[in-house]
């Protein structure tokens, strides 16, 4: 499959926002989990449930371990939406060019009172690849601009990482809409507590909540929702898919 991204998109008349269970789109998801913690499994199942709401899905994979599953998401009939591209090579210049083209075309649709295309970008364990998260003033990483402007373009993004602290702070603590944590080390967990504590939940509370969730086994995750107020910020994703609110300790 080609690693080049075609940049032309067509207008559509559907609403550019939709909901799926707890989640409201467009959205930026961050998903953190150590190997074998169920991180990619959760993302794969989420994609299976929401994919038909999108016109295009682009998936960057850091490894080929899960390639067969993600490739299987595409419909055998190429004329049916969504168009799905699975890429194994990350090129910052290619992504930036695609994003700027998408930005221009989406804004043209919005200005013409038409609904923008629904596009989903998935970055699965590619944080270590050159130019993805690192940045400098002369040449910022495309993900910085994407994370800051996705809402205005009807664009949704999923970023997965084995480590919380490896993701830059604007994304891990500010710009995301939903943060899902399957399993992390204590250094990451302490930082999560520090960056997400509020008037109702202390950093220690957050750590204890996560430990309790994880004690129920793989498949149980903690959700931090920036789509809710501070009192309803923390949620339990159960192994059976049910999502329940966590009240202050």
Describe the predicted segments one by one:
Residues 29-49, 62-64, 90-202:
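Conserved P-loop NTPase motor cores
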Residues 77-94:
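Conserved P-loop NTPase mechanochemical-coupling segment
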Residues 2, 73, 81-83, 216:
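Compositionally biased low-complexity segments enriched in polar/charged residues
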Residues 3-23, 44:
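Pre-Walker A adenine-sensing motif
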Residues 23-29:
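Pre-Walker A (Motif I) flank of P-loop NTPase domains
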Residues 73-77, 196:
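Short secondary-structure boundary/capping segments
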């Amino acid at each position: 499959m080609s690693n080049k991204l075609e940049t032309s998109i067509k207008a559509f008349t559907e609403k550019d926002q939709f909901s799926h269970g707890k989640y409201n789109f467009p959205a930026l998801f961050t998903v953190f989990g150590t190997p074998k913690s169920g991180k990619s499994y959760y993302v794969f199942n989420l994609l299976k449930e929401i994919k038909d709401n999108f016109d295009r899905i682009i998936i960057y994979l850091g490894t080929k371990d899960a390639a067969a599953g993600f490739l299987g998401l595409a419909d055998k009939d190429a004329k049916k939406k969504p168009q799905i591209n699975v890429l194994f090579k990350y090129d910052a210049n290619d992504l930036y060019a695609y994003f700027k083209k998408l930005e221009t075309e989406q804004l043209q649709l919005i200005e013409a009172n038409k609904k923008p295309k629904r596009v989903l970008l998935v970055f699965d364990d590619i944080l270590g690849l050159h130019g993805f998260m690192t940045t400098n003033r002369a040449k910022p990483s495309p993900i910085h601009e994407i994370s800051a402007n996705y809402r205005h373009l009807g664009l949704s993004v999923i970023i997965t990482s084995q480590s919380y602290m490896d993701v830059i702070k604007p994304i891990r603590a500010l710009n995301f809409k939903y943060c899902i944590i399957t399993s992390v080390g204590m250094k990451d967990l302490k930082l999560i507590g520090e960056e997400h504590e509020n008037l109702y939940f202390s950093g220690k509370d957050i750590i204890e909540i996560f430990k309790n969730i994880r004690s129920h086994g793989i498949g149980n995750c903690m959700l931090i929702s920036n789509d809710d107020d501070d009192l309803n910020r923390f949620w339990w994703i159960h192994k059976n898919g049910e999502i329940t609110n966590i009240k202050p300790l």
